[in-house]
């Protein structure tokens, strides 16, 4: 039995890989810590069988959640597991999440392809973002929730519809009328690179002034810390300690942060920029976004720019230089100082976290962090303590 845990604030998703029976139930019960949770989701996508011992484990977790005023939800039950839930009456006790709608993208226009997924145009009014194989459906459900929160805050984001599946992949459908990918617009008119960069800088500045709803949005620093703690098989205790130390040094904030803000997650609709990817929308320091943008466009040796945006590396570097100039032009000087002291650490965070949830990129990201970014982070740490 393999157990995957994803904690987002007071919501935790526990994904079971294997049978939940007398052999595995004790470990599952230990791992399903309910303290401080408002919602505990148990995902049965890869769990083909549950025994009476497994049922008792689920009931124990349900009682704990109920006693603290929380909710336990079971989702993605196979027909065999659903039958067991029905026969035992468990389906009348435990909340069951509805099954996502199945779609096909055969013949659909591919708008963009990146590290996490692909965007397809379904029709003149809607697009779907499909996550890569191996990315859990909870990511799509989370994105829908955060997209709605951003829309309410007035952040220019596409209207989200429903969570869907396409074969073994999951995704989310958005409304977008006659829109073009921002990366495509940049590739078409690279001579306007400074103008394009200023548009992203203005969008980022606007997003970073919005106050986040703590009832809906998680604290990004807490999420990052949780991911780092799961990297014991990839990095040494000293390296993990260093990453956590650098994370704690980044100031807290009560404003919004996107954590995947780049030109292939933005569409141009009627001349306005509209964000289409809100899966990591959170509350936290704007430095997390600036580090992500720097990683994609300003660190050419990583090769992320062409992978994520199809913009050539040299153009990406010019884009970063212009973005940096425009973004920090109207920010407090201390923000620029924080970024300069932590730029390599901040640039490493996105791919460091992705080691946990993007299995198809795991080896590459570990190598890039270890060989390229960690030595620079260590140098930053020595500089800050000097």
Feature map (PLM): residue ranges:
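Catalytic activation segment of kinase domains across protein kinase-like and atypical kinase folds
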Residues: 267-290
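Juxta-kinase regulatory segment immediately upstream of eukaryotic protein kinase catalytic domains
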Residues: 100-106
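Amphipathic alpha-helical interaction surfaces in cytosolic regulatory modules
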Residues: 22-93
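An alpha-helical support segment within catalytic cores of ATP-dependent transferases
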Residues: 209-259, 263-270
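ATP/Mg2+ or Mg2+-diphosphate-binding catalytic cores
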Residues: 349-386
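Active-site activation/catalytic loop segments of kinase-like enzymes and analogous catalytic loops
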Residues: 290-331, 346-362
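Short beta-strand/loop segment at the start of cytosolic alpha/beta domains
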Residues: 1-15
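ATP-binding pocket architecture of kinase catalytic cores
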Residues: 109-215, 251
């Amino acid at each position: 039995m393999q157990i995957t845990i994803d904690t987002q604030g007071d919501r935790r998703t526990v994904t079971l890989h294997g049978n939940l029976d007398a052999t595995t139930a004790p470990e599952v019960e230990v791992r399903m810590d309910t303290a401080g949770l408002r919602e505990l989701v148990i995902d049965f996508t890869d769990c083909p069988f549950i025994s009476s011992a497994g049922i008792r484990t689920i009931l124990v977790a349900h009682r704990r959640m109920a006693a603290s005023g929380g909710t336990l939800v079971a989702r993605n039950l196979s027909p065999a597991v659903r039958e067991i839930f029905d026969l035992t009456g468990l389906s009348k006790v435990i909340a069951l999440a509805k099954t996502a709608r199945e779609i096909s993208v055969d013949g659909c226009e591919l708008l963009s392809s990146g590290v996490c997924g692909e965007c397809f145009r379904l029709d003149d009014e809607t697009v779907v973002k499909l996550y890569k194989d191996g990315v859990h459906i909870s990511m799509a459900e989370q994105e829908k929730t955060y997209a709605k929160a951003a829309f309410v805050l007035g952040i220019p984001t596409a209207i989200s519809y429903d969570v869907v599946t396409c074969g073994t992949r999951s995704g989310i459908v958005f409304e977008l009328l006659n829109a073009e990918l921002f990366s495509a617009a940049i590739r078409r008119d690279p001579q306007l690179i400074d103008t394009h960069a200023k548009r992203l800088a203005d969008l980022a500045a606007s997003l970073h002034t919005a106050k986040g709803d703590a009832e809906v949005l998680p604290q990004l620093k807490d999420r990052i810390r949780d991911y780092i703690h799961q990297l014991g098989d990839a990095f040494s205790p000293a390296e993990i300690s260093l990453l956590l130390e650098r994370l704690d040094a980044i100031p807290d904030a009560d404003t919004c942060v996107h954590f995947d803000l780049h030109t292939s997650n933005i569409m141009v609709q009627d001349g306005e920029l509209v964000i289409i990817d809100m899966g990591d929308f959170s509350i936290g320091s704007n430095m997390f976004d600036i580090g992500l943008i720097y990683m994609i466009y300003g660190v050419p040796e990583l090769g992320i720019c062409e992978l994520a945006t199809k913009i050539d590396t040299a153009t990406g570097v010019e884009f970063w230089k212009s973005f940096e100039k425009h973004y920090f032009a109207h920010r407090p000087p201390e923000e620029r100082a924080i970024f300069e002291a932590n730029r390599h650490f901040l640039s490493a965070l996105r791919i460091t976290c992705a080691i946990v949830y993007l299995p198809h990129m795991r080896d590459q990201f570990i190598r890039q962090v270890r060989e390229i970014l960690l030595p620079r982070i260590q140098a930053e740490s020595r500089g800050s303590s000097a």
